[in-house]
Curated annotation (Swiss-Prot):
InterPro entries: DiS_bond_form_DsbB/BdbC, Disulphide_bond_form_DsbB, DsbB, DsbB-like_sf. Residues 1-11, 64-70, 163-166 are cytoplasmic. SUPFAM superfamilies: DsbB-like. It comes from Azoarcus sp. (strain BH72). GO terms for cellular component: plasma membrane. This is Disulfide bond formation protein B. The keyword Transcription regulation does not apply. The keyword NADP does not apply. GO terms for biological process: protein folding. Keywords: Cell inner membrane, Cell membrane, Chaperone, Disulfide bond, Electron transport, Membrane, Oxidoreductase, Redox-active center, Transmembrane, Transmembrane helix, Transport. Its main location: membrane.
Length: 166
């Protein structure tokens, strides 16, 4: 196994920069390419933003020892949450419903319903959650999100269980 570097600050800051680039690309697709995000896409953006914020705080803090594991655990939980949304959307894209329904937007659902009612509606997905509007190398945005959340989860596991350089 590759040993963790003594100074993990550049690693955390690189994760922050990568998440910022992913979010910037999503905003580019939305504002300049006209691809409107569905509720699941927006939740994935929130998860990437949270991974980025956790990494930024860790990079500025420069933790050692148990602190690295705390940040690694937070990154793992956030990456798994975002990855589960991306996996659900990928599944919906592979097996779309017979007649997709266009549900309300995320903002409307969160304003009009309590969170306990809105979350199941979001995960049922709207008709546009199963649409594939953009691909790169044969993979949709949801597929790429799933891969990126998987990479973040692997990095978090490395932070949690990797050997330390003495």
């Amino acid at each position: 196994m590759i040993a963790l570097p003594r100074n993990r600050r550049p690693l955390f800051l690189a994760v922050f920069a990568y998440c910022a680039a992913l979010l910037a690309f999503g905003l580019y697709l939305q504002h300049y390419q006209g691809i409107e995000p569905c509720p699941m896409c927006i939740m994935q953006r929130y998860a990437f933003a949270l991974v980025g914020v956790i990494a930024l705080v860790a990079g500025l803090h420069g933790p050692r020892g148990a602190g690295v594991r705390v940040y690694g655990g937070l990154l793992l939980l956030t990456a798994l949450a975002g990855g589960s949304v991306a996996a659900r959307q990928t599944w919906m894209q592979l097996y779309p419903p017979e007649i997709p329904e266009c549900g309300p937007g995320l903002e409307y659902m969160l304003e009009s319903f309590p969170l306990t009612s809105a979350l199941p509606m979001i995960f049922r997905g709207a008709g546009d959650c199963s649409a594939i509007d953009w691909t790169f190398l044969g993979l949709s945005l949801a597929n790429w999100s799933l891969l990126n959340f998987g990479a973040a989860a692997l990095l978090a596991l490395w932070l949690l269980f990797g050997r330390r350089v003495r």
